[in-house]
């Protein structure tokens, strides 16, 4: 079983004349909740992601940090981020699982000029269709979290799929399945928000007064959320943006030029019809016949 076209609610690069796809049935939005306060940085989730998706990154060089690999890539869809910070005169080691946030309003999808290369399912998962990718990299620029990565081998972009192939058959993502401390949870978005509120309340009783849920409104909310000790300072967690938003360039492109492109297409099509009706399809043939007649007269 796999998702069908009827399960898709958005496609990249569809113009104003293309009707929006409709999900065949109501599907609850799903979400992955990552509780960074119980993560031990074991990287089991990284291994599970690599195994399930059959991706193998090259062995990098040790640069003096625990991060390995050092960054996301086309063959590393999730990495552990480690940050040493000082808060309230105490040294803290903050750990965050990094990867696609699956935004409700995805900047990558809006920026993509290749039709159908990026899609969003009714449950909120944002997926890349690599066979449609043209390798332009616009999705990378459009992502406020700097997640997608271009593979130089095939000139296509890749990212976490939230294990959509597992979710469709009722399984949880591979990283959730393998986490030994239960730091990663998966379910409906509402149930994950409820779980997060319970965890935040517990953290506040332990002295973390600024604990909270990271579910940024600037991108319409996300389908990967974090429970943070210091929710008032998300940038402490390896630069997690405080108020991520779709760039003004992407908004301008989709807000103004997209409808203008649709109008231009319609105008061109209408002009072609009027030309056909008013002038007719045989004008070129008539001119060619006249030219042949003139040449025949000259020969005589």
UniProtKB/Swiss-Prot annotation:
Membrane topology, Periplasmic segments: 280-300
Swiss-Prot/TrEMBL keywords: 4Fe-4S, Cell membrane, Electron transport, Iron, Iron-sulfur, Membrane, Metal-binding, Repeat, Transmembrane, Transmembrane helix, Transport
Cofactor: [4Fe-4S] cluster
GO cellular component terms, A-Z: formate dehydrogenase complex; membrane; plasma membrane
Cited CDD domains: FDH-N
Binding site for [4Fe-4S] cluster 2: 49, 160, 163, 175
Cofactor note: Binds 4 [4Fe-4S] clusters per subunit.
Membrane topology label: Single-pass membrane protein
Annotated [4Fe-4S] cluster 1 binding sites: 39, 42, 45, 179
Cellular location(s): Cell membrane
GO molecular function, one term: metal ion binding
InterPro entries in the cross-refs: 4Fe4S_Fe-S-bd, 4Fe4S_Fe_S_CS, FDH_Electron_Transfer_Unit, Formate_DH_bsu_Proteobacteria, Formate_DH_C_sf, Formate_DH_Fe-S_su, Formate_DH_TM
Record field: transmembrane: 261-279
One Gene Ontology biological process: cellular respiration
Record topological domains on the Cytoplasmic side: 1-260
Sections of the chain in a coiled coil: none
Residues that coordinate or bind [4Fe-4S] cluster 4: 112, 133, 136, 139
Function summary: Allows to use formate as major electron donor during aerobic respiration. The beta chain is an electron transfer unit containing 4 cysteine clusters involved in the formation of iron-sulfur centers. Electrons are transferred from the gamma chain to the molybdenum cofactor of the alpha subunit.
Assembly and interaction partners: Formate dehydrogenase is a membrane-bound complex, formed by subunits alpha, beta and gamma.
PANTHER family given in the database record: FORMATE DEHYDROGENASE, NITRATE-INDUCIBLE, IRON-SULFUR SUBUNIT, FORMATE DEHYDROGENASE-O IRON-SULFUR SUBUNIT
Entry protein name: Formate dehydrogenase-O iron-sulfur subunit
Organism: Escherichia coli (strain K12)
């Amino acid at each position: 079983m796999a998702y069908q076209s009827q399960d898709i609610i958005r496609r990249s690069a569809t113009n104003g004349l293309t009707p929006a796809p409709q999900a065949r049935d109501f599907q609850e939005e799903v979400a992955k909740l990552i509780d960074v306060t119980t993560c031990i940085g074991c990287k089991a989730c990284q291994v599970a992601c690599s195994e399930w998706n059959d991706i193998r990154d090259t062995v990098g060089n040790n640069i003096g940090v625990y991060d390995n690999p050092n960054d996301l890539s086309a063959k590393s869809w999730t990495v552990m981020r480690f940050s040493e910070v000082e808060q309230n005169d105490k040294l803290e080691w903050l750990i965050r699982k990094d990867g696609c946030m699956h935004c409700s309003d995805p900047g990558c999808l809006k920026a993509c000029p290749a039709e159908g290369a990026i899609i969003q399912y009714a449950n909120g998962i944002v997926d890349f269709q690599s066979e449609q990718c043209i390798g332009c990299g616009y999705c990378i620029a459009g992502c406020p979290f700097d997640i997608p990565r271009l593979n130089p081998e095939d000139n296509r972009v890749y990212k976490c799929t939230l294990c959509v192939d597992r979710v469709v058959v009722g399984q949880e993502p591979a990283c959730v399945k393998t986490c030994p401390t239960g730091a990663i949870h998966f379910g409906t978005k509402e149930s994950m928000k409820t779980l997060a509120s319970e965890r935040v309340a517990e953290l506040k009783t332990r002295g973390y007064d600024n604990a909270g849920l990271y579910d940024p409104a600037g991108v319409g909310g996300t389908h990967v959320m974090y429970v943070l000790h210091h929710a008032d300072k998300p940038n402490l967690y390896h630069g997690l943006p405080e108020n991520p938003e779709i760039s003004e360039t992407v908004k301008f492109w989709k807000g103004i030029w997209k409808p203008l492109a649709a109008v231009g297409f319609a105008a061109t099509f209408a002009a072609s019809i009027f030309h056909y009706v008013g002038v007719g399809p045989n004008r070129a043939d008539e001119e060619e016949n006249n030219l042949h007649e003139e040449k025949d007269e000259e020969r005589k």
